[in-house]
Amino acid sequence: MRRPHTLLAALLLAAGTAAAQDYGQAATLKIWDNTTAPHSNGIATPEREPEPNRIVDVSQAVLYIFPADPAKATGQAVVICPGGGYVKLCIDYEGYDMAKWFAANGITAAVLKYRMPNGHPEVPLEDVEQALRIMMGLEAGATGFTAGKVGIVGSSAGGHLAASASTLAETKPAFSILFYPVITAEKGKGHQGSFNALLGGSRNAESD
């Protein structure tokens, strides 16, 4: 088992810290932004928080790390994807509140502030896959958790992202926990706003 404090030290060395909100996390790791990621979401306006813990116009992917309680550490970790209809992130009750619960129960949690798709569905998917790679220690210089012990958690639109990572990404989580996920695009059953924000003008019957 690779210990959480070893992971944090290695990640901080490899990725550096990013100035960010204080949610009680032990470390804040910048993954990339629109200039360094494989794809851009095309959002040029600065990130905003129009109401507490509701973040919009996200163009920089960041991980907030909550280490497991050492007395209860299981050697497992999760990447948490908050929801928000792919237009904002509800980062409290679908993010760091969950992370604190997992950490208190021996599971290191990393809340992912992923970039909004803005009609570019590949953007949040590449963010979550990179987050998984970091937590698994697959990036140069990082010592992560055993790949078979890194899972993913997602709520609402974040549940859609978690499900996408579990089925479409090259680097897949070992397990998935989905809370009220947006799964179907069928009219009258799925949240249409999430799919409109995810796919933008490219949405059609085939993409649904």
Whereabouts are the PLM-identified features?
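Bacterial N-terminal signal peptides that target proteins for export
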Residues: 1-8
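Hydrophobic h-region of N-terminal signal peptides that target proteins for export
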Residues: 11-19
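Alpha/beta-hydrolase superfamily serine-hydrolase fold, recognizing
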Residues: 21-208
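A ubiquitous, low-specificity "background" feature that marks scattered single residues
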Residues: 9-11, 133
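Alpha-helical structural signal
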Residues: 8-9, 195
